[in-house]
């Protein structure tokens, strides 16, 4: 049974200056494991990655029904399968979590579906 669905979109133009300055926002959004993946990418891919992960965590908080104030960005970890598919490795949700992230030239969009146990 579906517990919640969340979707979020992030403009890449808002993330680009953050990546270029290597600001503290990056450490607030990404877990240490996500940061390891992030650091291996080109600047263009870092912008897409950070925007996608932020959108994913926002979408999770919407699906969870609390918003980001009740669940922290560090509480949700989105890693990558060998195939390139994202998956939620850690979260406060005990059931299954389905994630989809897509990018255009200007946006990153993520959708989360939470399934109850």
Swiss-Prot record:
Residue sites binding Mg(2+) per the record: 8, 58
GO cellular component term, pick one: cytoplasm
Cofactor(s) required, per the database record: Mg(2+)
GO molecular function: holo-[acyl-carrier-protein] synthase activity; magnesium ion binding
GO BP terms in the entry: fatty acid biosynthetic process
Subcellular location: Cytoplasm
Keywords for this protein: Cytoplasm, Fatty acid biosynthesis, Fatty acid metabolism, Lipid biosynthesis, Lipid metabolism, Magnesium, Metal-binding, Transferase
HAMAP family documented for this protein: AcpS
Reported function: Transfers the 4'-phosphopantetheine moiety from coenzyme A to a Ser of acyl-carrier-protein.
Name of the protein in question: Holo-[acyl-carrier-protein] synthase
Source organism of this protein record: Enterococcus faecalis (strain ATCC 700802 / V583)
Gene that produces this protein: acpS
């Amino acid at each position: 049974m579906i517990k919640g669905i969340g979707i979020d979109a992030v403009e890449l133009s808002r993330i680009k200056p953050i990546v270029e300055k290597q600001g503290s926002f990056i450490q607030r959004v990404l877990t240490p494991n996500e940061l390891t993946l992030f650091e291996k990418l080109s600047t263009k891919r870092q912008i897409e990655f950070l925007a996608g992960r932020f959108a994913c965590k926002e979408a999770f908080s919407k699906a969870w029904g609390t918003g980001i104030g009740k669940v922290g960005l560090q509480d949700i970890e989105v890693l990558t399968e060998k195939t390139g598919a994202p998956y939620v490795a850690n979260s406060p949700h005990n059931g299954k979590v389905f994630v989809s992230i897509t990018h255009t030239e200007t946006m990153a969009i993520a959708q989360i579906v939470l399934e109850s146990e």
